[in-house]
């Protein structure tokens, strides 16, 4: 049976999006996993905890015996059925546990006895994790161009359209502002870093690229933070600033934060609950910057938001949101971004409207 155990093997797995049958307990998987992994554990959280306690108190032989006792009979058969189905569905996949130790070898041997030969990652998740950390450190050394600009300038779309672009906000499942949450929950920090490394590896393998195109992000994107090695390189990078007319920015923001988010919430939750979730999303975003707005201004904008939602529910029109969005941009977001940009003015190498910046980046 094959085993994968070299650095290049691990990178090849990530680049190919090789399906990984991860047999660690759910709690381990939630703390960090590879992008193409599915969790089909040998032991659930309670079983793992019991075996761990037994190991500390009585040693490895007793712990192994307890594990076999806990995963036996109908429980073992149910898990075997799940592994067998996953192997047949993913014939090019691979098994993985924490360190390539007993759990993946036990599952591999049980599958072999059932007539299925399936490879495993020698070194397990720990080896893959070290690979993603090292890959990010290495790939972050390539030159970087950052796309900057005020809220609504289409920075993310511009990055997405570049063959050497990596959408950090998309990977983080967050758009980086108080209103940045999406309907997808954010990944754990380790899983986010693994996903980022895999995306960088795949992009580099496709392009053999000379430089990265990234959005000008702060250290935090929602609850995820950028790896320090990448963040440090970004602080030294050249910046191209998108300067689109205010009206165009409003159109983009209307599409992204009102029309699309309303659609996404109602699609996910149904009309009634979806509407409530959408309203809560907008109120939560405004509330998150209450202290910076000041209580009086926050209350004024919150009242305008309520009025806009009432109009939208009655007529379907999102035009009413301009009454609070315009002052929010002019009084808060735009001054904040300009202040941040002033502190790194020497890094700005190009300014222009969206299409001009896209053309400039393409020529790099």
Swiss-Prot record:
It comes from the Bacteria. The active site is at 97 (s-selanylcysteine intermediate). InterPro entries: Rhodanese-like_dom, Rhodanese-like_dom_sf, SelU. Keywords: Selenium, Transferase. GO terms for molecular function: transferase activity, transferring alkyl or aryl (other than methyl) groups; tRNA 2-selenouridine synthase activity. It is an enzyme of class 2 (transferase). Residues 14-137 form the Rhodanese domain. One of its GO terms (biological process) is tRNA wobble uridine modification. Pfam families: Rhodanese. Its EC number is 2.9.1.3. The keyword Transferase applies. The keyword Transferase applies. Gene3D superfamilies: Rhodanese-like domain. It catalyses: 5-methylaminomethyl-2-thiouridine(34) in tRNA + selenophosphate + (2E)-geranyl diphosphate + H2O + H(+) = 5-methylaminomethyl-2-selenouridine(34) in tRNA + (2E)-thiogeraniol + phosphate + diphosphate; 5-methylaminomethyl-2-thiouridine(34) in tRNA + (2E)-geranyl diphosphate = 5-methylaminomethyl-S-(2E)-geranyl-thiouridine(34) in tRNA + diphosphate; 5-methylaminomethyl-S-(2E)-geranyl-thiouridine(34) in tRNA + selenophosphate + H(+) = 5-methylaminomethyl-2-(Se-phospho)selenouridine(34) in tRNA + (2E)-thiogeraniol; 5-methylaminomethyl-2-(Se-phospho)selenouridine(34) in tRNA + H2O = 5-methylaminomethyl-2-selenouridine(34) in tRNA + phosphate. PROSITE patterns: RHODANESE_3. NCBIfam families: PRK11784.1-1, PRK11784.1-3, tRNA_sel_U_synt. Involved in the post-transcriptional modification of the uridine at the wobble position (U34) of tRNA(Lys), tRNA(Glu) and tRNA(Gln). Catalyzes the conversion of 2-thiouridine (S2U-RNA) to 2-selenouridine (Se2U-RNA). Acts in a two-step process involving geranylation of 2-thiouridine (S2U) to S-geranyl-2-thiouridine (geS2U) and subsequent selenation of the latter derivative to 2-selenouridine (Se2U) in the tRNA chain. Belongs to the SelU family. Monomer. This is tRNA 2-selenouridine synthase.
């Amino acid at each position: 049976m094959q085993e994968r155990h070299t650095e290049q093997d691990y990178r090849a797995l990530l680049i190919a999006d090789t399906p990984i049958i991860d047999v660690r307990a759910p709690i381990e998987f939630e703390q960090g996993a590879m992008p193409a992994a599915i969790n089909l554990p040998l032991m659930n959280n309670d079983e793992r905890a019991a075996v761990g306690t037994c190991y500390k108190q009585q040693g490895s032989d007793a712990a192994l015996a307890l594990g076999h006792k806990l995963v036996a009979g109908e429980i073992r058969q149910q898990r075997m059925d799940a592994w067998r189905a996953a192997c047949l569905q993913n014939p090019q996949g691979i098994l993985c546990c924490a360190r390539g130790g007993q759990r993946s070898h036990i599952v591999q041997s049980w599958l072999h006895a059932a007539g299925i030969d399936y490879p495993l990652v020698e070194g397990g998740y720990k080896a893959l994790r070290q690979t993603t950390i090292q890959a990010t450190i290495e790939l972050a050394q390539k030159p970087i161009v950052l796309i900057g600009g005020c809220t609504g300038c289409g920075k993310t779309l511009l990055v997405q359209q570049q063959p050497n672009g990596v959408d950090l906000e998309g990977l983080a499942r967050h758009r980086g502002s108080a209103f940045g949450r999406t309907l997808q929950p954010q990944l754990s920090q380790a899983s986010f870093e693994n996903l980022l490394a895999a995306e960088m590896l795949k992009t580099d393998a496709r392009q053999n690229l000379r430089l990265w195109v990234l959005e000008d992000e702060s250290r935090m994107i929602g609850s995820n933070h950028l790896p320090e090695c990448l963040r440090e390189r970004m602080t030294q990078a050249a910046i191209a600033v998108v300067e689109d007319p205010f009206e165009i920015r409003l159109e983009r923001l209307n599409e992204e934060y009102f029309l699309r988010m309303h659609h996404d919430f109602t699609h996910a939750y149904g009309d009634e609950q979806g509407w409530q979730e959408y309203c809560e999303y907008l109120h939560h975003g405004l509330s998150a910057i209450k202290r910076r707005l000041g209580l009086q201004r926050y209350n004024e904008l919150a009242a305008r938001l309520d009025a806009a939602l009432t109009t939208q529910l009655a007529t379907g029109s999102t035009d009413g949101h301009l009454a609070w969005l315009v002052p929010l941009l002019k009084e808060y977001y735009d001054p904040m971004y300009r202040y941040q940009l002033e502190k790194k003015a020497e890094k700005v190498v190009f300014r222009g409207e969206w299409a001009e910046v896209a053309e400039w980046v393409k020529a790099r």
